[in-house]
Amino acid sequence: MEMDKRMKSLAMTAFFGELTTLDIMALIMSIFKRHPNNTIFSVDKDGQFMIDFEYDTYKASQYLDLPLTPISGDECKTHASSIAKQLACVDIIKEDISEYIKTTPRLKRFIKKYRNRSDTRISQDTEKLKIALAKGIDYEYIKDAC
């Protein structure tokens, strides 16, 4: 399965800055009934720990245009508490995905927009995103416009 263009468009426009890789994993489980093939312990450009989820041809971080760097086994010790916290969240999500979605307002909104927004509207949002990025316009402005 390839990365879903509708989901990517919504994540980069209407939900820019609101979602995490954990949210993306939960959305993929809920919408597509897919579990990740692999879990990758990573850090972002600021050194903040994040779990990335690998699927057949993409990673959860790609939905967010988030460049993550995998960490080594030695670095895991430094991030042990964050790893434990995020793995606990993963277990909670996997245990009852529908309950997790129901109790997370931004994910409920995302799924509602994903299911109800027309392909035309999502295509228009994607086109706005491409034009704005080509002109160097900030993501926050794009989010407000969509």
Swiss-Prot record:
Subcellular location: Host membrane; Host cytoplasm
Pfam families: Pox_H7 (PF04787)
Family that this chain belongs to: Belongs to the orthopoxvirus OPG112 family.
InterPro entries reported for this sequence: Poxvirus_H7
Organism expressing this protein natively: Variola virus (isolate Human/India/Ind3/1967) (VARV)
Keywords: Host cytoplasm, Host membrane, Late protein, Membrane, Transmembrane, Transmembrane helix
Functional summary from the UniProt entry: Contributes to the formation of crescents and immature virions (IV). Interacts with phosphatidylinositol-3-phosphate (PI3P) and phosphatidylinositol-4-phosphate (PI4P) lipids in order to form virion membranes. Mechanistically, mediates proper formation of OPG125-hexamers, and hence the honey comb lattice and spherical immature virus.
Principal location listed in the UniProt entry: host cell
Membrane-spanning residues: 10-32
Cellular compartments per GO CC: host cell cytoplasm; host cell membrane; membrane
Factors inducing expression: Expressed in the late phase of the viral replicative cycle.
Topology with respect to the bilayer: Single-pass membrane protein
Name of the protein in question: Late protein OPG112
Lineage top rank: taxon: Viruses
